[in-house]
Amino acid sequence: MSKTLSEEPYNKSHNCKGAVRRKGRKIIAKKFREADAILIGASNGLSITEGLHLFADNAAFERLFGDFKRKYGLGCILQGMMAGWPSEEEKWAFWARLIHHYCGQYQPTPVMNNLKAIVGEKDYFVVTSNGEGHFELCGFDPTKIYEIEGNWFTMQCARPCHDTIYPSLEVAEKLSAAEQSGHVPTELVPRCPKCGGPMDIHMGADQRMIPDTAAHARFQNFLKTYHGKKLVVLELGIGWRNQLIKAPMMRLVASEPNATYVTLNLGEIYITDNIKEKSFGLDGRLDELLPALREACEA
């Protein structure tokens, strides 16, 4: 028989009454306060909450990329990120505009400020498939962030002829300022300092993306440090099909006797049966759930 959060940790919060949800938040807050460390997993649900929707042909996409949409038939930001561009001048015009808008002009949002407040002074680590770099821009320590699919702040040789990654934010800002009619000047197009070939933003899941071995090593060291200790795994905006973050996180919780799993997502809560006794699931908008959790943690 299924039970509510007042009876056992596992909960699909949309099936619970308000009083039970409030009690659930208090239980979760207690877990945060008692935790030795917090492991944050984040995917596109967090980006969407902040106003960045890679998959949507929405008003924001029309405002930023309406000209690209009509010229190239792009249906969303992700299609532009994966496009085979006719020229490097056009490719970098797209990326410069994207990075300038979502990174160069970015200001920390309430959802990220609430997340920082929940973490407080505890040790933490962030594992994310989001490439826009908002964790770092909001003041999270970049040495405690593992962006498993790369990020927009760095670029690499497109071949690649070597495994060095280079900063791209300042370059993108210069390109954005120089862009005219969907093109950037040829002389400003980034070139590989080794082979002279084209450069790509350091992101993606194919074999050409240079892996961030240093960040991966730091993540493994974090897990080693808190093995057997009270670790809260906080998952933000990740659907059940996610094999890059969600599946490994649940396996980690299953292997750690003192770990607690907290998943926040809109419209879909998935927790495997083998960890449900030490898991919490809250169904709702992150910009509503995180302030409520922050309030519970500070009570």
Segments (PLM) and residue ranges:
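Conserved catalytic alpha/beta core of Sir2/sirtuin-type deacylases, generalized to analogous enzyme cores
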Residues: 1-299
